Amino acid sequence: VQEVDDGLRTHLPAGAELEEIENAVRAAGSGASISYSDAGEIDWATMWPARVGVRRVGRIAVAPPWLAGEIADAEIPIVIEPATAFGTGEHETTRGILALMQDVIRVGDVVSDLGAGSAVLSIAAAKLGASRVAAVELDEQAIGNAEENIERNGVRDRVTMIHGDAALLLPLLAPVRVILANIISSVIVELAPAMRAALAPDGRVIVSGILVSERDALLAAIEPLGFELRAEIADGEWWSAELAPC
C-alpha cells in the first residue's frame, strides 16, 4: 500500500474479488471511492535490471545480484534480489532507515523488522551486529523472496522470517531493543501502543514510509504514548525518524 496525495494506492492479484473490496470500502462509511486499472502482465526479470542499481548509504551498500561485484569493497555489502518485494534501496524510505539504524544498532541487539518485505533491513541489522532479528511480514507472497535474500547474505543464523500480524506478534517478541517499521503512517500509529509495550527500556524505534507533510500529525499521535523524537531525515517528500521511550 502506498499513500498518495489523494488517497491510497495498492496492487491486487489477478482474480481478486473487486466487487467485494468495493462493497467493504463503502460499508466502512468513510465516504471513500475506489477505482481500478489493469496493470497487465509484468515481466519482472526484464524490468528490474533497467530500474535497480547500486545504492550506498553510509557503511552499507545494496545491489542486485547482477551488480554484486560493484559492492565488494563496501564495509557492509547487501545483495537483494528485487522480485516483487519492496525494499531494494532504491526508495527514499528504505535509505532513510538504513542511514538511521547505523547509529542505533549495537552488537548483540534484539531487533524486530515490521513489514520486512525483501528483508533488506533485517539483513542490514544482522550485519550491523544484531544477534537476533525477527523479520515480520503480512504478505505471504513476499516471504519466499525474503527467505532467499536472507540465505544469500549469510545471515540465516540470526534472521528469522515470520509470516503474521505485527500487532499480534510484538508481545511475543518482547523485549526488543530496536524496532524497524518502514510502513505507512496510519499503520505506524495503529502499531505504536504495541511497539511501545514491546520496547526495552533503552530501546529505539526507527520509522519510515511517512510523508514530510505527515510528520507533525504522526508525532502528535505517538508522543502521548511515551515516545520522543531523537533524530530525523527528510529525503525529498519522505521522512524517517528515530524514536525513543520517554
Each model region followed by its residue ranges:
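Short aromatic/hydrophobic contact patches that present stacked aromatics
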Residues: 9-11, 85, 180
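Conserved beta-strand segments of alpha/beta enzyme cores
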Residues: 33-35, 61, 132, 158-160, ...
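S-adenosylmethionine
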Residues: 104, 138-246
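Short beta-strand micro-motifs in enzyme catalytic cores
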Residues: 6-8, 76, 239-241
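Short, well-ordered coil/turn elements that cap or connect secondary structure elements
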Residues: 29-31, 57, 73, 106, ...
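N-terminal auxiliary segments of SAM/dcSAM-dependent transferases
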Residues: 1-72
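Conserved SAM/SAH cofactor-binding pocket of Class I
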Residues: 84, 88-167, 175
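Proteins enriched for Cys/Gly/acidic motifs involved in redox and nucleic-acid/cofactor modification
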Residues: 54, 58-92, 98
